Every structure is written in C-alpha cells, then in structure tokens.
C-alpha cells in the first residue's frame, strides 16, 4: 500500500468536496460537523493512513467556510489521535493499527442496523410504505403454484437436500445468463435464499476484519450491513450516470490492498445508473490487474425499460476475478426468497461449502416454483417491465406536482426514483413522514459514509392508487417539516 505520500485525492477543490459530500448536514457548529465527517471518512477507510490532508486555506476555500473552521476541525481530530500536525509539513492521518482492529467488533455489532431498520418498518395503523423496493407478485406465481405442487410431490421421494440448489433451477439460471452474454454452466450456479444471502456469503467467504473493500456510495443498504458484519474497512466510491467512479477506484487500488469491490452495474440501487459495456470491461481489467475480486449485483438487470442492459461484468473477465449475483425477487416476487451466485467452479465450491454450514440448501418448494417461472420468463418479464415503466412515470409526475422543489433523473430501468431535497435532512423528514402515515428511506441509509441525507429513495413498485396517496401524505409531511425547519432557523440563527 502506497500511503506515506498519499494526498486526499488529486487535491482539487471539487475532489475534496466529493469526498466530504453532505458534511454540513445536521446540527451544531460547523467545525464540529466537519471534524465528524473527517473522522467518519478516516474510520471507514475513505481517507487512508498516511494521507496528507489538504492545507487549511485550500480546504476552507473548497468548502466555502472560514479557515478557522478547518483549523478547529483538524485540532479536534488531533486531540482524538486520528491525525498528526507536523510543523512545516501539514496534517497527516495517523496509522490506525490496533484502533482499526478494535473497531472491527464494534462495526460488526452495528452492521445489521440498516437492513433491520428497513425490514422492521411495518404498515400498521394504515401507514403507506414508500421505502421497500419490492414489487408484488406477478400473476404467474399463483397460476403455476398447482404445477409446482405436482413437481414437489414427484421430487418428494428424494431426500430434498441439494446444497448447491435444485438442479432444474440451476439449469434455468445458467440458460438465462448465457442468453445475456455470460456463458454459464449449471456447475457454475449456486442457489441462495435471496440476493441478500448471496451478498452475505461472498462477504463472509472473501473478506476478513480490517481488510479493505470498496462499495458504491450510495448503494444497497443490505450490502453495507453484510460487509460491516465482517469487520472490513469500507472505502466508498461515488456513483455517476455510468456507475461507480472507476477513476477513483483505480486510484484506491493503487494505494491500498483491496480485497473486494461490490458494484451494481445494471440500474444501480438507488441511483438507477447503468454502466456501459466499455466501463464494465474496464472494471474487469482493473480487478484482474490488481488481484481484486469484483462482486457484481445484477438483481435489477432484467428490468430495462428500453434497451437491454449489457452483459454482466463477468463476461469481460478472465479467470476468477468476478462473481455475479442475482435475484428473482424483483422480477417475480420477493416472497420466493430465491437468489443465486454465478462463479467459476472452484470458487463456487468454496461458497457452496460455506452455505451448507448455514442451511444445507434453500427452500425446495420456492426453487421448484422459481424454475417454472424462469421457463416462462420471456412471457412474464415484459409484463413486469411495462408495469414498472408506467408506475415510474406516475411517481415522477406525482413528485413534480406535489413536491415541486424536489429533483430527480428519470430512470431507464430498475425500481426506484432517487430524489434530492432542496434543503433539510431526509432523516428528520422521515420521522415527520412517519407521523403523517408515510414510510420513506433516507438517503443516508444507503451510504457507507452516512452521506446523502439530502436524498430520499422512492420506489415505484406499489399500485397507482397507493403511490398517489403515499406521495400526498409525503407532501403534507414535507410542508410540516419545512415549517419546523423555518422556526428552528429563527430560534437558533445561523451557526458559523
């Protein structure tokens, strides 16, 4: 790892602002908020040990604050032992050593908070969910249940344990991936209990405490949970219109021994970004050059509104540098709890042994039904896509009408609208929205760095009448929140 001469990015104002995006959100003096943001970046590995922080005046200019704010923030970090201030040579991030190892247990304890917080929300008392990106079932789930029951009766003479998955389902998944441009054999497919288990298995198999992993920022909350559970040090890379920032990934790979990169190249959750073929090839090459594993999450890949998504990253990789995971929850029904991992056979065997420790194989009835659904995928998926396209347009129209200050880019596929607030905190808004009967996911819950608290992820998976009522409730909550925010500013004044 080349760290003793590293700077925080190339040193330009925009790059620094990108690393500290959202630092000013919240309450308290600016220097306290800046120190907290820098501390979080150091603890999570966004700023590596041995990094020289930007000079005070330059950072102050980039962040549009007074130099005294940066001086006070650096002094606070020095008191905590996170940085050293060297006369004539600037401020440097200290090697964290035992501190980082000691935090592994703490991070593992905290790991489940995001996914549990999402899954523990309920819709009692008539609350409308605008947070869960899980569509209701397609009609074929009910239509094929009787046929699935007959197949289950037939295979019940078998002991029912297939640790790698029900063979006909593995064959159907392999066919589907091959049709997308990634040649796949049944022996390269492991069936999992949803994509979440697939993510957790790859995290447990390939990452240990204190090791570096790169996650997109923002990303799927369940991935943050899974990698924190391992005690890994998370390096966050921003997401643009074409996916994860590969220039920054290249820089990080040159400076740190990164074990794994988690990326969602097809209709990224939550931004809906789509990575072009050239970028997929480039990421595969970067991983191969640096001996780093890429775990690509293709859970949304089949949900393109217009042109199909490019082949998975693994189609451009040599050897075992890319593992592909996916799910049938977003296409057919979340209640199936069927996901999969596609990897070269030696890697897959390792993952299969690890999965057997957990459950000896996923639910057979769900797998039987999933295999039947995949046989009719070319008939079912276009219906699902048309439904989502219509609901996406409706949600966009509702947000524009009832929340006119909010901004978003129209998605080309996937399940969610990534909306930006004109001001305020999405976490605070979520509490007001809940009191008004609408449940939303603040952007900070999608961020390994706790950024994006000025964003809200809004899925368009609900029925049209539910979307309309939910947005109306959210609009009432926004009006109430803005009133609270205005009163608070009058009482507290501007903090400098």
What are these regions (language model features)?
Residues 1-150, 352, 356-362, 372, ...:
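N-terminal basic, amphipathic alpha-helical segments
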Residues 65, 343, 418-423, 440-479:
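Conserved PLP-binding active-site segment of the aspartate aminotransferase-like
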Residues 84-85, 184, 440:
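Short beta-strand "wing" residues that participate in macromolecule-binding interfaces
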Residues 156-290, 302-319, 467, 482-496:
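Conserved core of the PLP fold type I
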Residues 157, 351-358, 374-396:
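Structural signature of PLP-dependent enzymes
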Residues 297:
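Glycine-centered flexible beta-alpha turn that most often forms the glycine-rich phosphate-binding loop
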Residues 371, 388-396, 406-420:
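Conserved glycine-rich beta-strand-loop-beta hairpin in the small C-terminal domain of fold type I
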């Amino acid at each position: 790892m080349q760290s003793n001469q590293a700077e925080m990015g190339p040193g330009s104002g925009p790059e620094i602002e990108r690393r500290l995006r959202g630092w000013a959100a919240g309450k308290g003096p600016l220097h306290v908020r800046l120190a907290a943001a820098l501390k979080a970046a150091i603890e999570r590995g966004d700023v590596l040990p041995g990094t020289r922080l930007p000079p005070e005046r330059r950072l102050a200019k980039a962040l549009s604050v007074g130099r005294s704010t940066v001086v006070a923030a650096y002094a606070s970090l020095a008191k905590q032992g996170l940085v050293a201030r060297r006369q004539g040579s600037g401020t440097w991030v200290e090697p964290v050593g035992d501190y980082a190892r000691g935090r592994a247990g703490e991070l593992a304890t905290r790991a489940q908070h995001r996914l549990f917080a999402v899954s523990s929300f309920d819709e009692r008392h008539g609350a409308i969910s605008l947070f869960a990106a899980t569509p209701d079932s397609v009609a074929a789930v009910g239509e094929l249940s009787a046929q699935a029951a007959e197949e289950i009766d037939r295979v019940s003479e078998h002991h029912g344990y297939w640790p790698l998955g029900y063979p006909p389902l593995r064959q159907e998944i392999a066919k589907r991936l091959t049709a997308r441009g990634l040649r796949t054999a049944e022996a390269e497919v492991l069936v999992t209990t949803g994509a979440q288990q697939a993510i957790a298995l790859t995290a447990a198999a390939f990452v240990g405490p204190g090791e570096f992993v790169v996650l997109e920022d923002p990303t799927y909350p369940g991935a943050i949970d899974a990698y924190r559970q391992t005690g890994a040090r998370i390096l966050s890379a921003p997401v643009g219109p074409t996916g994860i920032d590969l220039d920054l990934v290249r820089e990080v790979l040159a400076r740190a021994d990164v074990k794994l990169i988690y990326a969602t190249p097809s209709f990224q959750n939550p931004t809906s970004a789509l990575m072009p073929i050239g970028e997929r090839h480039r990421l595969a090459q970067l991983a191969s050059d640096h001996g780093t594993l890429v775990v690509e999450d293709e859970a949304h890949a089949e949900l393109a509104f217009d042109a199909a998504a490019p082949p998975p990253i693994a189609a451009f990789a040599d050897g075992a540098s890319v593992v592909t995971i996916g799910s049938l929850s977003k296409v057919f029904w979340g209640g199936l709890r069927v996901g999969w991992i596609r990897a070269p056979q030696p890697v897959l065997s390792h993952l299969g042994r690890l999965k057997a420790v957990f459950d000896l194989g996923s639910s057979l009835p769900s797998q039987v039904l999933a295999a039947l659904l995949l046989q009719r995928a070319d008939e079912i998926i276009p219906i699902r896509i048309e439904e989502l396209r219509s609901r996406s347009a409706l949600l966009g129209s509702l947000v524009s009408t009832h929340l006119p200050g909010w901004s978003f880019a129209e998605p080309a596929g996937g399940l969610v609208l990534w909306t930006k607030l004109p001001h305020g905190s999405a976490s605070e808004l979520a509490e007001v929205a809940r009191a008004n009967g609408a449940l939303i996911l603040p952007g900070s819950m999608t961020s390994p760095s706790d950024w994006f608290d000025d964003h809200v992820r809004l899925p368009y998976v609900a029925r049209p009448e539910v979307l309309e009522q939910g947005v109306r409730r959210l609009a009432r909550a926004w009006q109430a929140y803005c009133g609270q925010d205005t009163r608070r500013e009058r009482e507290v004044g501007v903090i400098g």
